Amino acid sequence: MIVRTLDECRDSERRVASETWESVRMLLKNDNMGFSFHITTIYQDTETHIHYKNHLESVYCMSGEGEIEVIGGETYPIKPGTLYILDKHDEHYLRAYKDKEMVMACVFNPPITGTEVHDENGVYPVLD
């Protein structure tokens, strides 16, 4: 059995941050569960370009509000209780509104190793 707390993961190398977000990677590839689980904070009043060419992701909004704009498609509001699933490697923009950051629970398949950040195209590489 594996037991971890958000606080202990946040205070370790499992916390990865960029200019627009931070991700606490609580479950990773080396945990051998077949997926990874993260608590990700999207900073308020930011926009992040993302395109997971190598991963599928499901995201549940726990707090805050914003929107997701699928490139070439629709824009969907995000608020607590919203689940969105990127099941087609959807290229998108993720925006948090000005008044509050968004806190999201995220699941990735295949699992990430823990050090990945978005490249210039919004992509996470596949790492061993």
Curated annotation (Swiss-Prot):
Q: List, alphabetically, the Gene3D superfamilies matched.
A: Jelly Rolls (2.60.120.10)
Q: Which UniProt keywords apply?
A: Lyase
Q: Name one GO biological process term.
A: ectoine biosynthetic process
Q: Which GO terms describe its molecular function?
A: ectoine synthase activity
* Enzyme Commission numbers on file: 4.2.1.108
What is this enzyme's class at the first EC digit?
A: lyase
Give the SUPFAM superfamilies listed for this entry: RmlC-like cupins
Protein's pathway: Amine and polyamine biosynthesis; ectoine biosynthesis; L-ectoine from L-aspartate 4-semialdehyde: step 3/3
Q: Is the keyword Lipid biosynthesis assigned to this protein?
A: no
Q: Which reaction does it catalyse?
A: (2S)-4-acetamido-2-aminobutanoate = L-ectoine + H2O
Q: What does this protein do?
A: Catalyzes the circularization of gamma-N-acetyl-alpha,gamma-diaminobutyric acid (ADABA) to ectoine (1,4,5,6-tetrahydro-2-methyl-4-pyrimidine carboxylic acid), which is an excellent osmoprotectant.
Say which family it is in: Belongs to the ectoine synthase family.
Q: What is this protein called?
A: L-ectoine synthase
Give the source species. Aliivibrio fischeri (strain MJ11) (Vibrio fischeri)
